[in-house]
Amino acid sequence: MKTLQPKDIEVFVTQAGKRLCRGSLQHEIAALRGLLRFLALDGRVPPGLDKQIDTPRLYRLEQLPRALPWPMVTELLKSLDLKSDIGLRDYAMFLLIATYGLRASEVVELTLDDVAWRKGVLRIHQRKTASALELPLTNEVATALTKHLKRSSPPAPYRRIFLRKRAPIGVLKPTAVTEAFQSLVRHSKLSIPFEGPHCLRHSLAVHLLKSGTPLKTIGDILGHRTAESTSMYLRLATGDLRGVSLAVPRSRNTGNGVRP
């Protein structure tokens, strides 16, 4: 590795850029820089290689949200095996994301105390905004949670709704939700290009927008801090926006050069 040259790094970054979006490439380059600095201190690569890498420029909201057509979301959920413990757990998790736009971290942190069954309320602790949100508990979600808990009630001292299904039993991590989603996509045979459950969150936002839900309401549900974060979904609903646009009257020439 002592013969490593800047051109070798450039080849690696170029190849990585073919499979990664610019945001992911930026993270990859940051990790690579750290590795090169460490190896240079250890004398295993020439010093200064970490400074030879250009970081791709990112623009806020430049990428389109990763949304699926709503019928595909429904079909994906239907493909789960509801006869198995894991199938019931995963169905409840992904239904929560598709219904409320939860993040994976918010799903795994749900506890039995967050569900007010009699009041019909679900309490969400939004990490990103450090706020709590109370949403109506839909019948479909309540049924899914009930079936999951009847089959897999969390043992003491756990209060989390979703736990590991294989030993050792413990809390579920957000990465496990991603892995479960990837497994679901593979078994569903659906053509879904996205690798994480976050696409269900984006799909809900676009579905609500196309259904006429105000942008402010969508932002509140998703836990966005600013309206700008929610407005990015407008780019996926341009066809619907054209349908409600107002016609611009054409100007008429009166013959004397004056337009009324």
Give the positions of each predicted feature:
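Conserved catalytic core of the tyrosine transesterase superfamily
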Residues: 1-260
